[in-house]
Amino acid sequence: MSTKTNIQKDWEQREFIEDMSINIQKIVEFLNKFELSTRNKLSDLNEKLTILDRQVDYLEATFKTVQE
């Protein structure tokens, strides 16, 4: 009986390890997709902020020349 119990415990441990490995892989895939998505969104936001910054600089320069 002890051998059978040991074999059963071994299988349970192997199944647990396999389940953990699969779940870790899923988490890694999610994080990689999230990182890519976030990087793209931040890049788009950076471009928009750069455009807005240039527009503000232009408006400030225009306003200064009008005041003079």
From Swiss-Prot:
Q: Where are the transmembrane segments?
A: none
Its GO CC terms are: cell leading edge; cell pole; cell-cell junction; cytoskeleton; filopodium tip; pseudopodium; SCAR complex
User: What keywords does the record list, in alphabetical order?
Assistant: Coiled coil, Cytoplasm, Cytoskeleton
Biological process according to GO: actin filament organization; cell motility; filopodium assembly; mitotic cytokinesis; pseudopodium assembly; regulation of actin polymerization or depolymerization
Its annotated compartments are: Cytoplasm, Cytoskeleton
Q: This protein's superkingdom?
A: Eukaryota
Disulfide bonds, paired cysteine numbers? none
For this UniProt entry, the molecular function terms from Gene Ontology, in alphabetical order, are: identical protein binding; molecular adaptor activity; protein-containing complex binding
**Record-linked Gene3D superfamilies:** 1.20.5.110
Coiled-coil boundaries: 37-62
Q: What is its main location?
A: cytoplasm
Query: What is its quaternary makeup?
Result: Part of a Scar/WAVE complex containing brk1, scrA, abiA, pirA and napA. Interacts with scrA.
Q: Its family?
A: Belongs to the BRK1 family.
What job does this protein perform?
Involved in regulation of actin and microtubule organization.
> Can you say what this protein is called?
Protein BRICK1
Q: Which gene encodes it?
A: brk1
